[in-house]
Design a protein with these regions (language model features):
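Conserved C-terminal beta-signal and adjacent last beta-strands/turns
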Residues: 6-8, 21, 85, 197-200, ...
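N-terminal periplasmic "start-of-domain" segments of outer-membrane beta-barrel proteins
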Residues: 32-62, 91
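Extracytoplasmic beta-strand/coil segments of soluble accessory domains associated
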Residues: 68, 72-110
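Short acidic/polar hinge/loop motifs at secondary-structure boundaries
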Residues: 111-138
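Gram-negative outer-membrane beta-barrel transporters
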Residues: 171, 375, 466-470, 484-557, ...
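Periplasmic-side early beta-strands and strand-to-turn transitions of outer-membrane beta-barrels
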Residues: 171-187, 191-277, 552
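Structural signature of Gram-negative outer-membrane beta-barrels, strongest in the C-terminal barrel
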Residues: 244, 336-342, 346-469, 502, ...
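Outer-membrane beta-barrel signature, preferentially recognizing the C-terminal barrel domain
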Residues: 268-289, 293, 415-500, 521-527, ...
Length: 620
C-alpha cells in the first residue's frame, strides 16, 4: 500500500474509531440548517444535497488565509494558484470543471466579470475578514441560480451589524512570505481590517475596511528573481432600516481593488520569464435589497450595479471595462411545512468594452418546489427558462429526491439528483482581444449524482457522493476559442466525515476522487485529502492542525508546450489562538507548510514554503 492509501485509510479509521469511543458526557448537538440548495432554512436531514458550510468560527480559525485558500480545503474543490505567489491567477477546478462553471453570490447577488475570459468572479477581490459564513453547493444549480452554475455555487454572506449601538472589531496580522528555498523569515505580509457597526432603533449599519499587502516572493520560480508585491484595499458600507415587522430595506456600496506585479512572456522569445509586468483590478458595486414578509411567505428583490476596470501592463497589455446590472425578484411561500415554493424572475444586463462596446442580456423566469414528507420522502425540483438575447431560449431543470429514516439518535438518508445547466459563451470569448469567435455555441452540462449520509445528535456525520458530469460543446482554446467536437465526461467520488462529540475536540476529513473519462484536464488532481483536528484546551487557548494531500497532476510547460507529470505533495499547517481581556482580545499564530515541503503547483511559478504569521483581533 502506497503512502497515499495509508493516509486516506488512517484518517477514515481514526474517525470511525473516535465515533465508537464518543464521550458519554457529550452535549447533544443542535440540528444543522442549510439554505442554499432551496433558499429555505431546512434541516440538513431534509436536504437532498451535501451542502458545505463554513461558519464564522471556522473563518476565525483561518485568519490570515485568503478566501481561496480556505475554500481549497473542502471536498470536490481544487483552487489552483492558491499556494503560489499572492497575485497568482486562480483556477476554480470543482468537480472537474473550471472557472466559467462556478457561480459566486455575495449576499444573494450574482457577481461576475463580463470582461474576463471565463466570465467568473475574481476571488482575489474578497476580504475574508468581512465574511460571516459561506455555503457551497456542488453540482448543477442553474434552476435556482442561472447561467454558469454548472459545477458549484459559492454563496457568501457578509457580516451583519451588531445589536449594540456601536461595536468595533479590528484585526492586524504580520508575517513572512517566502519560498521553500528562502527561509530568512523577513516580514513581508501585512494584513489589516476594521469593522464599525451597530444598531440605533430600527436603523442598522456596518462599515468595513481592509488592506492586504504581501511582498517577498516572485511569480516566476527562482529566489534571485525580482519580488512581485500584491496590494489590495476593500471598503464597504451597508445600511438597513426595519420599517415594520413585515418590511425591511437594506442597501450597500463597496469599492474593492488590487494591484499586483506579475511575470510574463516577453518578446522576442515569448518564454515565461521574470518581467516588470503589472495587473490592476478595480470593482465598484452598489445595490439594494427590499424584503416584504407576509404570513408563511415573503417577497424579496436583490438588485445591484457593478463596474469593473482592469488593466494588464505588459508586452501583451490590455485595458478592460465592464458593467453589469443584476436583478433577482422572487416570492417564497411555505405550505404547512410540507411544500416550500419559490417563483422568481432574474434579469441580467452585461456590457464590456473591447474594440467597441459589446453586450447581452438575460431574462429568466424560474420555479422551484421542495416537498418534505412525514414518512421520509423529500423532493427538490424546479425549472428555469433561460432567455438569452444572443442565443435564444433554453430550459434547464433539476430533480433531486431523497429519503431519510431515523437511526438511533440520528438519521440516515439516501439521495440523488439529475440536473442540467446552460452556459452561453461570454463577451470575451465572442469579441475579446485574444482569439474571439462570434460563432461559438453554448455549452450544456448534465450532472447525475447519488449518495448516502448518516448523522447523529452527538456530533458525528459521514457522507459519500458519486457523481458523473457530461459536457457538450465544451468551449476550449486552441489558436482561438472553439467548441470541442467530443463530449467530455467527468466521474468522481466525494467522502466527508466530521466529529464534534468528544469534549473540546473537533475532527473533520474529506477525500475526493476526480477523473476525466477521456483526455486531460490540466492541474486537476485525481486524488485529494484534507484533514483537520482542533482542540480547545481551556476557555482561552485553542489549537488546530490541517493536513492536505494533493495527488499527481498534469501541467503544460509553456516553454516547450509539452505536458509534464507533477508529483503529489503534502502540506501541514498549524494554528494557535489565545483569548485575553474577557475575550475582547485574541492573539493568534499561523504556521503554514510546517515541514517546508518543496513542490510545484504550476510549472515555472513559485510556491510558498514554510511561513509564519502573528496577529491580534480586538473587539470593543
Amino acid at each position: 500500500m502506497n503512502s497515499k492509501h495509508w493516509v486516506i485509510s488512517g484518517i477514515l479509521c481514526l474517525t470511525i474509531n473516535l465515533f465508537y469511543s464518543q464521550d458519554s458526557t457529550a452535549v447533544e448537538q443542535l440540528k444543522e440548517v442549510v439554505v442554499s440548495d432551496s433558499r429555505f432554512e431546512l434541516d440538513r436531514e431534509n436536504s437532498g444535497k451535501t451542502v458545505i458550510q463554513i461558519s464564522r468560527q471556522e473563518i476565525e480559525h483561518n485568519q490570515g488565509r485568503t478566501l481561496a485558500q480556505l475554500i481549497n480545503t473542502k471536498s470536490g474543490i481544487e483552487i489552483n494558484g492558491s499556494r503560489s505567489v499572492e497575485g497568482q491567477n486562480l483556477g476554480y477546478f470543482i468537480r472537474g470543471g473550471n472557472n466559467r462553471q462556478v457561480l459566486v453570490l455575495i449576499d444573494g447577488v450574482q457577481v461576475n466579470d463580463p470582461s474576463l475570459v471565463n466570465n467568473e468572479y475574481d476571488l482575489r477581490l474578497v476580504d475574508l475578514n468581512a465574511i460571516e459564513r459561506i455555503e457551497i453547493i456542488k453540482g448543477a444549480s442553474s434552476t435556482l441560480y442561472g447561467n454558469a452554475a454548472a459545477t458549484a455555487v459559492i454563496n457568501i454572506t457578509t457580516k451583519k451589524a451588531s445589536k449594540d449601538k456601536v461595536a468595533i472589531s479590528a484585526t492586524t496580522i504580520i508575517g513572512t512570505n517566502q519560498s521553500e528555498g528562502d527561509q530568512d523569515y523577513d516580514v513581508n505580509s501585512f494584513i489589516n481590517s476594521v469593522s464599525v457597526n451597530g444598531k440605533l432603533g430600527k436603523f442598522d449599519y456596518i462599515a468595513n475596511f481592509g488592506n492586504r499587502f504581501v511582498d517577498g516572493l516572485s511569480a516566476a520560480a527562482g529566489d534571485e528573481n525580482e519580488k512581485d508585491p500584491f496590494s489590495r484595499f476593500n471598503t464597504s458600507l451597508r445600511l438597513g432600516y426595519q420599517f415594520s415587522d413585515q418590511f425591511r430595506l437594506s442597501a450597500f456600496i463597496s469599492q474593492d481593488n488590487f494591484k499586483t506585479d506579475i511575470d510574463g512572456f516577453p518578446a522576442p522569445l515569448f518564454l515565461f520569464a521574470d518581467t516588470n509586468d503589472k495587473f490592476l483590478s478595480e470593482q465598484f458595486r452598489v445595490g439594494v435589497s427590499p424584503e416584504f414578509k407576509y404570513n408563511n411567505g415573503s417577497v424579496q428583490v436583490n438588485a445591484a450595479f457593478t463596474k469593473i476596470d482592469r488593466e494588464t501592463i505588459s508586452d501583451f497589455g490590455s485595458v478592460n471595462e465592464a458593467e453589469s446590472i443584476v436583478l433577482d425578484a422572487f416570492n417564497k411561500y411555505n405550505f404547512n411545512d410540507k411544500f416550500y415554493t419559490i417563483v422568481g424572475l432574474n434579469y441580467g444586463d452585461y456590457k464590456s468594452k473591447f474594440s467597441e462596446e459589446e453586450s447581452y442580456n438575460t431574462i429568466d423566469p424560474y420555479l422551484n418546489v421542495v416537498y418534505v414528507s412525514e414518512f421520509g420522502l423529500n423532493i427538490n425540483t424546479g425549472a428555469r427558462y433561460n432567455n438569452h438575447s444572443e442565443y435564444g431560449s433554453q430550459l434547464v431543470y433539476n430533480v433531486n429526491p431523497s429519503y431519510r429514516t431515523k437511526v438511533g439518535s440520528g438519521y440516515a438518508k439516501v439521495f440523488g439528483s439529475y440536473a442540467t445547466s446552460f452556459i452561453a459563451p461570454n463577451l470575451s470569448q465572442l469579441f475579446g482581444f485574444f482569439g474571439p469567435n462570434p460563432d461559438l455555441e453554448p455549452e450544456e452540462n448534465v450532472t447525475i449524482e447519488g449518495g448516502l449520509e448518516f448523522a447523529n445528535n452527538k456530533g458525528f456525520r459521514v457522507n459519500g457522493v458519486f457523481f458523473t458530469r457530461d459536457e457538450q460543446n465544451t468551449i476550449i482554446f486552441t489558436d482561438a476559442y472553439t467548441n470541442a467536437t467530443d463530449d467530455a465526461t467527468v466521474n468522481g467520488v466525494e467522502i466527508e466525515t466530521m466529529l464534534t462529540s468528544i469534549k473540546n475536540l473537533s475532527l473533520s476529513a474529506n477525500y475526493t476522487f476526480t477523473e476525466l473519462k477521456e483526455g486531460v484536464r490540466l492541474r486537476l488532481p485525481k486524488h485529494k485529502v484534507n484533514f483537520n483536528a482542533g482542540y480547545q484546551f481551556n476557555d482561552h487557548f485553542y489549537a488546530s492542525l490541517n493536513y492536505q494531500y494533493t495527488g499527481k497532476r498534469i501541467d503544460t510547460d509553456f516553454s516547450t508546450f509539452m505536458n509534464e507529470d507533477l508529483d503529489a505533495f503534502s502540506v501541514i499547517d498549524l494554528y494557535f489562538s489565545h483569548q485575553l481581556l474577557d475575550n475582547k482580545l485574541k492573539l493568534f499564530m499561523n504556521i503554514t507548510n510546517l515541514l517546508n515541503e518543496d513542490y510545484v503547483e504550476i510549472i515555472g511559478y513559485s510556491t510558498r514554503g514554510r511561513n509564519v504569521s502573528l496577529g491580534l483581533n480586538l473587539n470593543l
